[in-house]
């Protein structure tokens, strides 16, 4: 049985000025599995005609099993194939199947894997007053900055992500928040019978760190809401649908070199979604992902373990891992601000909140990617990753454990760009 399924990362509250103790990570028990629902991954290299024939076969096998005694064994109502996903060379589908059909699928020569779908849980978020150190850290070469100071300068080129799109797979975004001006876009809502609004606040907070006019790293980037979570849970059925939509939208809009996906989500390793992130990379699309908040090696987390995503750990203002225990390990590519970070919030079009977690660290780096894309010709995700890592400042994190020890930096003090009169 796998551990907790992919969920939004914990944004931790503060109580009496201190970080609230983090609850033990949830473990996936039988109740986390969606009964009778599966994610099926097909083998690479199948022709379109083979895929069509496979799905016809699935429909016939499913119907035959429904008509048999075996179909009722699980006591679960089944519906057959539900949704189809195509990300670069990866073909997948979700479906509701009885136990016999699921076993038949596993034996099919066309099928790479059959995974039970799983519930995805949202972590609770509550509030702590103010902090503004994170942006100053981005341009300070990793030097410790005053925690509550509003005087820390954030230096950046005023192109600031202009002409770049940041896709936020999350709980939705309040695109009417004043921080987004006219740059917020409602993209895709995978949650049935729910409005395309942020009812949980996580997505709006993340988007504000990427592109808010006050709190954002890339203050002129567009943010696209891709809602895969509601106020309590989701499943990979919705997450894969949303990721599939994002990849298609980026591709169809000819934005591959001007788009970044932020995934402030984490859970136990789940290969179908890691495969989706990897195939989007092969298609030319950059993803930035959170390392997770379990205080463990991130190699066992999805999507942190996706080999070509940019995996982000969280640091405090004095270059230590937060007391909320950011994940670590060789899979962590970079460290970014992740404690006491102020950004947009729900509850009004000018609402703000201060939160902590690798959910906050990941959008700092996604914002940096958008910023660099607006300034430089970065022709591929590999070039983006190389540029981000080449700018990092080494050997500053005091407790990086087995992780590469490099913190985020936007390169402004070296005047890597032609910008003197455009610098803010």
Curated annotation (Swiss-Prot):
Its EC number is 3.4.21.-. One of its GO terms (cellular component) is extracellular region. One of its GO terms (molecular function) is serine-type endopeptidase activity. Residues 18-123 form a propeptide. Residues 1-17 form the signal peptide. Glycans are attached at residues 249, 262, 350, 390. One of its GO terms (biological process) is proteolysis. Gene3D superfamilies: Peptidase S8 propeptide/proteinase inhibitor I9, Peptidase S8/S53 domain. Keywords: Glycoprotein, Hydrolase, Protease, Secreted, Serine protease, Signal, Virulence, Zymogen. This is Subtilisin-like protease 2. The lineage of its organism: Eukaryota, Fungi, Dikarya, Ascomycota, Pezizomycotina.
